[in-house]
Amino acid sequence: MPDARHANLLEPEALVELFLRHPPQGFAAASEADLPVFGTDFDLLTTLEPAILAKIRRLPLFGLWSRLLRFPARFAGTTATEYAPLPKGLEPGALLDGFRERCAAGQSLLIVKDVPEVSPLLGAGDNEAAMRLARIAPDKGFIVVEGQALAYVPIDFSSTDEYLSRLSKSRRKNLRRKLKSRERLDIEAVPLGDARFGSLDVLEELYGLYLGVYAQSEIHFDLLTRDFCCKAGRSAAWYSVTAMTGNSWATTSALSTAGCSSTSTSGCVTRRHGSSTSIS
């Protein structure tokens, strides 16, 4: 995004602004010197592996003492972007010092969320700045949370057959079976802001599917609001890839950059032939 105000940003700036105007339920969001920040009570068990979390929940009196593991926290970043959008051109040490000065009051934890770790979708400058920030942040009392593993496919092949030829026999067979099922879908790229997203019924259906995905998730951190999802659907600032079969929808936000194809599916849902499936 060459015109972006923020480093590390794969998405349009409009998505950052939308997050600030309509933060997740129970969150408070603001822009501090062009740094998106949000505050919420953070449960230290949130990111534990499910097996470990299950063992902890079986400990005696867990329901009583577990509340002691929740702390007021202020985060630099958003829950709507792949990586933390940081102000361009600001030295990491100065950024962290400013964050502490403006946001530390009343907070038990200061967290920089979704710091990229040598991302193939970012330029060298953004990656180098992120590495410097990750090195110095702990010494300044910050917690650094790396971004989740990014799913992407380098576009270094000329055909589907060439791509499949690189895979194992079982993987090729599985993907060919899935590709055949694609024939039952009518696939169309529908820009957000399209008239179809002006229908409240469509937006309510998609939001209901999102809530179903949220309910099935093992990790509950941010619950996107109806306003956020409706405004996103009616925005023409970025696009979605939407598969439609009859009255069924499958939607994801999508982008491509640096010779790679990446699809962000946070907060998105799929419904195909009457069944609901989560994608994360």
Task: Give the role of each language-model region.
Residues 1-280:
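N-acyltransferase acceptor-side catalytic subdomain
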